């Protein structure tokens, strides 16, 4: 039976029967297009990024099986992880993007309506285990279809020079005056320690885990370990 899970709660728990599951679609790549006088067609610039995607489920609501209307609406409010039974081993970051027909739900014991989610472009592995690095030259392999934006926590002290090498090149990062630990979050493009903003302590680009092998090395201050949350992702 088809289902979806949003914010850790299954559609089955909410009294929803899925008549039509969401389609599997690839996000559109973003381009800028220019018309140039005297030139055929368009001049296209690839921005290297992707648009959001839409995942729509056509559902039947069985009022008797619904915990409560307030609980249903609270569940569908805000952003969270979305898992479809079609691809049950990965999730999207999503939020509901259409109005829920409250009047019809209240008046009818059984009602059919769509639930449409706007999703960030990529899907991510449900299993996103932290990888611990304690030795120079340790390699993390990205076997997914997209370069990933990891979150790294470096444990150590002093000024640390961190390098991450792949077939695409080297990320060179300097972390100044580290005391105990510092976190580099590529997804949010922030460097911090707890609630403390540490962007001024970091020089270099936020690292990407490229497809294939990524090798970690460091010099300078002392490093006891690096914890890597890889955030491996896919195009669908």
Residue ranges and their predicted role:
Residues 31, 54, 79-81, 149, ...:
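Exposed beta-strand and adjacent loop surfaces of beta-rich binding modules
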Residues 34-64, 109-122, 214:
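Oligomerization/assembly interface segments of phage tail-like spikes and tubes
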Residues 125-236:
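Intrinsically disordered, low-complexity segments enriched in serine, threonine, and glycine
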